[in-house]
Curated annotation (Swiss-Prot):
<comment type="similarity">
    <text>Belongs to the glycosyltransferase 4 family. MraY subfamily.</text>
</comment>
<keyword id="KW-0132">Cell division</keyword>
<keyword id="KW-0812">Transmembrane</keyword>
<dbReference type="GO" id="GO:0046872">
    <property type="term" value="F:metal ion binding"/>
</dbReference>
<dbReference type="InterPro" id="IPR003524">
    <property type="entry name" value="PNAcMuramoyl-5peptid_Trfase"/>
</dbReference>
<dbReference type="GO" id="GO:0051992">
    <property type="term" value="F:UDP-N-acetylmuramoyl-L-alanyl-D-glutamyl-meso-2,6-diaminopimelyl-D-alanyl-D-alanine:undecaprenyl-phosphate transferase activity"/>
</dbReference>
<feature type="transmembrane region" description="Helical">
    <location>
        <begin position="238"/>
        <end position="258"/>
    </location>
</feature>
<comment type="pathway">
    <text>Cell wall biogenesis; peptidoglycan biosynthesis.</text>
</comment>
<feature type="transmembrane region" description="Helical">
    <location>
        <begin position="262"/>
        <end position="284"/>
    </location>
</feature>
<keyword id="KW-0472">Membrane</keyword>
<keyword id="KW-1003">Cell membrane</keyword>
<dbReference type="GO" id="GO:0009252">
    <property type="term" value="P:peptidoglycan biosynthetic process"/>
</dbReference>
<feature type="transmembrane region" description="Helical">
    <location>
        <begin position="345"/>
        <end position="365"/>
    </location>
</feature>
<feature type="transmembrane region" description="Helical">
    <location>
        <begin position="72"/>
        <end position="92"/>
    </location>
</feature>
<keyword id="KW-0133">Cell shape</keyword>
<keyword id="KW-0131">Cell cycle</keyword>
<protein>
    <recommendedName>
        <fullName>Phospho-N-acetylmuramoyl-pentapeptide-transferase</fullName>
        <ecNumber>2.7.8.13</ecNumber>
    </recommendedName>
</protein>
């Protein structure tokens, strides 16, 4: 909204330097700074409020080190959501469908996560919101995003097609499977970020790295010259996604100010589901969802570790009448915890891997 006000001032009075408001790089930077300032300065009072109402419940099977965190408040994802939504409203073109679809995803899945956290923390219902209801929420978001992007003229150029990493001028057409694919990706990615949120700073740091890469792809894909040169899909208006992406990145960085070890607050499902859905929706809109197994490799591996653990345990229980495990505990970060790795070392090493995957994803722009 501030964007529209400043543009009006520019058109009416043409003050020196005001034309900068039209530049995506300026607005993306402004959104990033705004999100960072909101999280850092609102954080202390926000945490005090959460601490008086919402303390993190600790699972009985959690590692010993994790049990020490029973007095740390959760639902800190509300702070991330607040920072992202305010920054997007101020600096992005909110009438652009790319922008409001991301904002909708963050709000909707943030609400689903909040209900889950509230049931666990306040109502003391073990397990929180039943998985089937979370799935209903994820499917509902997938249907909205899928049907809207299928029918809206702003997305009609590529429609159900998507780009394939490493292959030049090659696309895959989902056809009638487009909407089911959208639902699957939103569900998978939001759950993956949720599973990764188990150590101080792990989910927020990796989400920031992944979203920064997607924001860069959005900026390049929204420019016809850059998109043509790099042989990636040109998405008219996708540059606005970069503005919201940078707000998400710096909201996560600001959250890390309080969430880094030892954490003063956890994001909870409120934050992890919101961030995961935002990553999925951004990737889908810029036609880079097939890059996610590489770019979001940490989230992918964490999810795979859980799937492998459950499948192997069930198979061995059926085959040998005794359940066996591949990992000491899943998700994978808990396996390393039980092997004696310090929490900070696990988180930093996972961040380093994410940065490596970030750079690998950028290499796909030319390895075609």
């Amino acid at each position: 909204m501030l964007y529209y006000f400043l543009r009006y001032i520019n058109e009416m009075f043409n003050p020196p330097g005001m034309r900068v408001i039209e530049y995506l790089t300026f607005r993306a930077s402004a959104a990033a700074i705004t999100a960072l300032l909101i999280t850092v300065f609102a954080g202390p009072s926000f945490i005090r409020f959460l601490k008086s109402h919402f303390l993190e419940p600790v699972k009985e099977e959690a590692p010993e080190e994790h049990r020490k965190k029973k007095d740390v408040p959760t639902m800190g994802g509300l702070l991330i959501i607040l920072a992202v939504e305010i920054s997007a409203l101020l600096w992005a073109k909110v009438d652009d469908p790319h922008v409001w679809l991301i904002m909708l995803a963050v709000l909707w899945m943030g609400l689903i996560g909040f209900i889950d956290d509230y049931r666990k923390v306040v109502l003391k219902i073990k397990g929180g919101l039943a998985g089937k209801y979370k799935l209903v929420g994820q499917v509902a978001l997938g249907l909205v995003v899928g049907f809207y992007t299928w029918n809206d003229p702003a997305f009609s150029v590529l429609l159900s097609k998507t780009s394939v990493p490493f292959l030049k001028n090659f696309s895959v057409d989902y056809g009638i499977f487009y909407i089911p694919v959208v639902i699957f990706i939103i569900t998978a990615v939001s759950n993956a970020v949720n599973l990764t949120d188990g150590l101080d700073g792990l989910a927020a740091g990796n989400a920031a790295i992944v979203t920064m890469a997607l924001g860069l792809f959005a900026y390049l894909g929204g420019n016809a010259v850059y998109a043509g040169y790099l042989s990636i899909p040109f998405i008219s208006g996708a540059g606005e996604i970069a503005v919201v992406s940078m707000a998400i990145v710096m909201a996560c960085v600001g959250f890390l100010w309080f969430n880094s070890n030892p954490a003063e607050v956890f994001m909870g499902d409120t934050g992890s589901l919101a961030l995961g859905s935002a990553i999925a929706v951004i990737a889908l809109m810029i036609k880079q969802e097939l890059l996610l197994p590489v770019l979001a490799g940490i989230f992918f591996i964490e999810t795979l570790s859980v799937s492998m653990q459950v499948a192997w345990f069930k198979f061995t229980k059926w085959r040998f009448k005794e359940g066996r495990r591949i990992f000491l505990m899943a998700p994978l970060h808990h396996h390393f915890q039980l092997k004696g790795w310090p929490e900070q070392k696990i988180v930093i090493r996972f961040w380093i891997i994410s940065i490596l995957l970030f750079l690998t994803s950028l290499m796909t722009l030319k390895l075609r």
